[in-house]
Curated annotation (Swiss-Prot):
Phosphorylation of membrane-bound AP1M1/AP1M2 increases its affinity for sorting signals. Keywords: Cytoplasmic vesicle, Golgi apparatus, Membrane, Phosphoprotein, Protein transport, Transport. This is AP-1 complex subunit mu-2. Signal peptide: none annotated. Pfam families: Adap_comp_sub, Clat_adaptor_s. Residues 168-421 form the MHD domain. It comes from Homo sapiens.
Amino acid sequence: MSASAVFILDVKGKPLISRNYKGDVAMSKIEHFMPLLVQREEEGALAPLLSHGQVHFLWIKHSNLYLVATTSKNANASLVYSFLYKTIEVFCEYFKELEEESIRDNFVIVYELLDELMDFGFPQTTDSKILQEYITQQSNKLETGKSRVPPTVTNAVSWRSEGIKYKKNEVFIDVIESVNLLVNANGSVLLSEIVGTIKLKVFLSGMPELRLGLNDRVLFELTGRSKNKSVELEDVKFHQCVRLSRFDNDRTISFIPPDGDFELMSYRLSTQVKPLIWIESVIEKFSHSRVEIMVKAKGQFKKQSVANGVEISVPVPSDADSPRFKTSVGSAKYVPERNVVIWSIKSFPGGKEYLMRAHFGLPSVEKEEVEGRPPIGVKFEIPYFTVSGIQVRYMKIIEKSGYQALPWVRYITQSGDYQLRTS
């Protein structure tokens, strides 16, 4: 089962607009939502699902609005939340910003969209490009589209319009990998994960078919266990344009792309990644009069690669003052509102090792709890490099007019949630 009704509430919990899909939950039940939300917030027990008797409220907050779905059955919660987020995405496509004013100014279109987005409590058409074929907006009024069959009915490509033309046909491919890392105070890696995306920026005429080939080292989770030095990708998700049947057969990623920017695929890699930037720190206090901090940073990636925009955030006591710094490279500054020293290194080549020393006065005699000390955080970006070793082997562009197109590939490895605890 899915949603019985969907409400859009203002910040005070007053319904701006609602749609009853099944009629099995009284619309007046929404009056219990805001008092329940406030109560749970005060108790520190706020949850994305709230219940009042037999009625369940599944909600999300966006700007100054609450989107709430009600149900009295054992609903598929993940489906409902996915629908609510997709609804926000569609509204933002139509109104640029989703807020109370845009709902009030466009309530006719909002009602039309709610009718098309869900049918009898189940998500129906949530692709904004399909919806824009027959629900159009001009001067806050609803227009009826031309009398023709929607593309979805004719099996046409809903995510790409016909007749697109460019003087120069190009495709830009970005392979971006974010490294999530957590190291404890003893230097042991507690969490190591790579989250990757392949993003495309497409400037191609006509209705081209693209075929993307990845290097032979890459295996997908469906193929079984990895062998030798191959990379096994997990949680692989594709854009709807990818022909999954073709992929299941021969692992070719074949698709007719949307125009412009889109995310072709995402993946995750749970593996023991060697920390790309290793941090060693010594923090010493002297009779509650001063604190000395020494931080050593080492680039543990290939010497031919360079990390750009490196920022190392080192926590300091909240009552520290009179900062003095000495760095072997880059610059350091004290950010008192965050209680950190930020050591910035513009360019950090692989294999290099740098040092930063900081001195602070400690006017207070309060004892700081060691276990409450935040970790050191690191930000960086390494171009022309992927941790997993994934590479685009080829990109074939096939279009009936036979034009030549240029594919450009860029690789970026960047920090995600990258933290090292201090002793």
